[in-house]
Structures are given as structure tokens and as C-alpha cells.
Amino acid sequence: MSNIRLIKRRIRVAKNISQVTKAMQMVAASKMKKAQEKAVSGKPYAQKILELVGELTKGREIDPMTYPLLSKNSAKKNLVILISTNKGLCGGLNSTLFRSLNNWIPKEQETDFVTFGEKGRLLILRLGKNLIADFSSSLFLNGVGGLLKLIVDGYTKGEYGQIYLVYNNFL
């Protein structure tokens, strides 16, 4: 008789767990939908900014004194800013990003890395690359000021010839 009670109790516990899981999925789906709407609503602005910068620099002589960030730089070292997640619960998001990065990294040039996201930091350290800054522990917007200073100073002082931003693009 106690076996039947035990089995019924386990069935009830399993149903409760199932209900909690469904509720969590609904909350996650709602949050995901809001995040997707924000990403989609910002896309036209990002596209227009890229077009404007392209038009401003296309076929024109750029005065390095006036626009130092738009002038050519002959430094051989590159800077890669890698934006990844802090946790791994995101399907193939990080693995696809890291595979693409690993295939793309210029092998013949010296490259420094800056990371946003714990998973990106761990990858760069595992690959034995030169990690000069990590903003994983701070909120993204809190780290932007330090990152901008690093980028502008590194480029204007001739430390970096090219600066790349590596991230997942929401389609």
C-alpha cells in the first residue's frame, strides 16, 4: 500500500515540476519576444548610421588632424572586441560565434582582444591569445566608457591598425 502512495506522490511531484517548467517557458518566451522587438526596431537606425559613415568617407581625402578615427593607420597590430554571453544556456549562439572567430582571426598579424562576456574571456584564454581587457563582470553600458578610451587611444597613438567588433547578428 505504501508503494502505491509513493508512486502517486511521485506522479504529483512530476506534474508540479511540469507546471513550473511550462510557466518558466512562458516567461522566457515573453522576454524573448520583447528583446526581439527591441532588436528589430533598432535595425533601421543602425543601418542608416552605417550608410552615413560610408557616404562620409567614400572617395574623400580625410584630414587626420580633423578626423583621426577615420584616417588610415599603418600599425600592424589588430584589436578585436568580442561580445559573447556570460552563461552557456543559449544553444549554439556562442559556439557559432567562436567557430567563426577562430576561422577568421588573422594568423599572421599580432592581435589583442577585449571581451564582453565570460564565455568569450574563457575562449580567448584557452586559445592562448593576448587578452588586454575584460568587461565581463560589469554591465555592458558601464564598460563602454573604458572601452571607448582604449579604442580611441590605441588607434590615435598608432598602436592598432584595425579594430574589429565580433558579435552575433540578430537576423
Model-based region annotation:
Residues 2-171:
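Conserved loop-to-helix interface motifs that mediate assembly, gating, or partner/ligand docking
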